[in-house]
């Protein structure tokens, strides 16, 4: 876990993926060396006030955005437009300034010589992309990704959509147990909506498979001060609230108290 630092960096390139998704690329070798898969940055458009479409919804807070890619100082943030904060970010172009606090949080543990299943849903895709690049040369990987529709789907090994517009129809966890058995999986990594993560955790608990999940939570400060992102972690008999921004966002799935959300 790093000590998050505040910086301003110019956007080098903006990549349009679809009507809903885009990537902002920055360049910083020091930040690149500090980042790890599963970590995130709190980011905000420096011109947030100007870019706000409604004066009553000015995006003052930073948005927690996971690291999508990180190679030699070239850092990417894959973002979905869902509210005023991300819409303000979507209006930035090359040369515009981005405010960053990070890298923050604890990332995924990295293993070698394992059979690994990655499972992601929706905007849970970006941290998995960075993770698979770190794992692929030393492990056997299989990646399942699910989304509501075709526009939520990106490159992976197995695709699931709620509406069946591409890949298999259903929820991504529907095929999880079969893949664990077929590919003799040792470890599962996951990131996505809370119901998906809870179901994935139920499956790995039943099959006694090691499982690390990345949780998403509303954040205010993003540096562990406000405790606004705390989630219940621990055993059923002895649990406590842990901060997603500090102790997380990655936790052992078996330690997350899903029933308390």
Residue ranges and their predicted role:
Residues 2-94:
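Ferredoxin-reductase
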Residues 246, 253-261:
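SAM/dcSAM-binding transferase cores
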Residues 84-220:
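FNR/FR-type flavoprotein reductase catalytic core
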Residues 173-177, 225-230, 259:
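Short, surface-exposed amphipathic charged segments that create phosphate/polyanion-binding patches used
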Residues 127, 194-195, 216-250:
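Local cysteine-cluster metal-coordination motifs and their immediate loop/turn environment
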